[in-house]
Amino acid sequence: MDYNLPIPLEGLKETPPTAFLTKTYNIVEDSSTNNIVSWSRDNNSFIVWEPETFALICLPRCFKHNNFSSFVRQLNTYGFKKIDTERWEFANEHFLKGERHLLKNIKRRKTSSQTQTQSLEGEIHELRRDRMALEVELVRLRRKQESVKTYLHLMEEKLKVTEVKQEMMMNFLLKKIKKPSFLQSLRKRNLQGIKNREQKQEVISSHGVEDNGKFVKAEPEEYGDDIDDQCGGVFDYGDELHIASMEHQGQGEDEIEMDSEGIWKGFVLSEEEMCDLVEHFI
């Protein structure tokens, strides 16, 4: 008796697609999440529109994790390629809408231990290089910090010296202005300076002559020395105070020593400023 036995389906002999591919296909096919992930317009790729939401909602349902980067790495191992630089769009020639049976043609890439070792060595090399760069930068910043500390210390020392000089100057002035003879000497020199300026103006005016309606200025060589002898100008404030203080009696040795230390160095006043100073104290 002959029996017509059924012929086994050819598909039963083939290896089914992996669980990862099947689950990924199901996620993309789910129309309820099209706003998160869906097929592209040409149905030959899929797009993850909202990666964060995809990781929080879709991945835990099928893969029991919410790591989007891990999902992308898995796609790479199955030959998927990211085809758009501005969005998360992936494609594989056998991953097509309505063609689930083609999933069996997608194979996982076999990675040898040597390839993995080389990859790890490359990562280790990059980490070491980054570490060396950080160490160099750290040394540079520390040196800069020390330089700034040194600069600040020098500025503090200069400030202290300036404050001491100012205090010594004020103490010296307070002692001097209490003595009438000192102020009289300053007034006398101030009046002499005013007189010198007036004489200078007279000398300049007297040497100008009218020549055919034009004012002719005399050459400075003819009487430049006389003008210099009669003119005042800018003088060192410390020298004036020193001279004035020496002109009256009763100056102590400590005051002379204070003046000789150079506390007046850098304090320069014009005759007009000296006049204002004298008028202020008198």
UniProtKB/Swiss-Prot annotation:
Top-level taxon in the UniProt lineage: Eukaryota
UniProt PTM: Exhibits temperature-dependent phosphorylation.
Main location: nucleus
Xref: Pfam families: HSF_DNA-bind
Ranges for region Hydrophobic repeat HR-A/B: 111-177
Compartments where found: Nucleus
DNA-binding region boundaries: 17-111
Chain location of the short sequence motif AHA per the record: 261-270
Subunit composition and interactions: Homotrimer.
Similarity-based family: Belongs to the HSF family. Class A subfamily.
Protein's job: Transcriptional activator that specifically binds DNA sequence 5'-AGAAnnTTCT-3' known as heat shock promoter elements (HSE).
Protein name per Swiss-Prot or TrEMBL: Heat stress transcription factor A-6a
Organism: Arabidopsis thaliana
Lineage of origin: Eukaryota, Viridiplantae, Streptophyta, Embryophyta, Tracheophyta
